[in-house]
């Protein structure tokens, strides 16, 4: 069965895994999902991920979740732009998540990056999700 929102599915798996106190979760592999996970690693929200071959030609990403003193590092992770409603933001209109304590993940012409990196690069794009 094809997913209508693969990034939203991965974010939901991460959210559910952290609420269930899992050490890792699995999600189908894709380049865009890996790019989003790279941003989460750079910003310190997950420990890491690895690509695992489940069957011949089918790969999944094992996402290692991160906890601080037994509590999930990710308190909130939510999809902003969906396939039915794309949300784009110019750099000057990019809102801060929880007054700068959280991040937004953007898909820009220069690649997938956090809102901090987008401000430094002076580039806007599609707001994929927000993390706190």
From Swiss-Prot:
<dbReference type="InterPro" id="IPR035987">
    <property type="entry name" value="Ribosomal_uS8_sf"/>
</dbReference>
<protein>
    <recommendedName>
        <fullName>Small ribosomal subunit protein uS8</fullName>
    </recommendedName>
</protein>
<comment type="function">
    <text>One of the primary rRNA binding proteins, it binds directly to 16S rRNA central domain where it helps coordinate assembly of the platform of the 30S subunit.</text>
</comment>
<dbReference type="GO" id="GO:0006412">
    <property type="term" value="P:translation"/>
</dbReference>
<dbReference type="GO" id="GO:0005840">
    <property type="term" value="C:ribosome"/>
</dbReference>
<keyword id="KW-0689">Ribosomal protein</keyword>
<dbReference type="InterPro" id="IPR047863">
    <property type="entry name" value="Ribosomal_uS8_CS"/>
</dbReference>
<dbReference type="Pfam" id="PF00410">
    <property type="entry name" value="Ribosomal_S8"/>
</dbReference>
<keyword id="KW-0687">Ribonucleoprotein</keyword>
<comment type="subunit">
    <text>Part of the 30S ribosomal subunit. Contacts proteins S5 and S12.</text>
</comment>
<dbReference type="InterPro" id="IPR000630">
    <property type="entry name" value="Ribosomal_uS8"/>
</dbReference>
<dbReference type="GO" id="GO:0003735">
    <property type="term" value="F:structural constituent of ribosome"/>
</dbReference>
<comment type="similarity">
    <text>Belongs to the universal ribosomal protein uS8 family.</text>
</comment>
<dbReference type="GO" id="GO:1990904">
    <property type="term" value="C:ribonucleoprotein complex"/>
</dbReference>
<keyword id="KW-0694">RNA-binding</keyword>
<keyword id="KW-0699">rRNA-binding</keyword>
<dbReference type="GO" id="GO:0019843">
    <property type="term" value="F:rRNA binding"/>
</dbReference>
């Amino acid at each position: 069965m094809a997913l209508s929102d693969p990034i939203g599915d991965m974010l939901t798996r991460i959210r559910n895994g952290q609420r269930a106190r899992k050490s890792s979760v699995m999600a189908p592999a894709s380049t865009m999902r890996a790019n989003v996970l790279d941003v989460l690693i750079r910003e310190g929200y997950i420990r890491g991920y690895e690509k695992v071959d489940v069957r011949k030609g089918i790969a999944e990403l094992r996402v290692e979740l991160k906890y601080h003193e037994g509590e999930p590092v990710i308190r909130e992770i939510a999809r902003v732009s969906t396939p039915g409603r794309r949300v784009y933001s110019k750099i000057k209109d990019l809102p801060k998540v929880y007054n700068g304590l959280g991040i937004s993940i953007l898909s820009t012409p220069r690649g997938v990056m956090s809102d901090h990196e987008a401000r430094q690069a002076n580039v806007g794009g599609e707001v994929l999700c927000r993390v706190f």
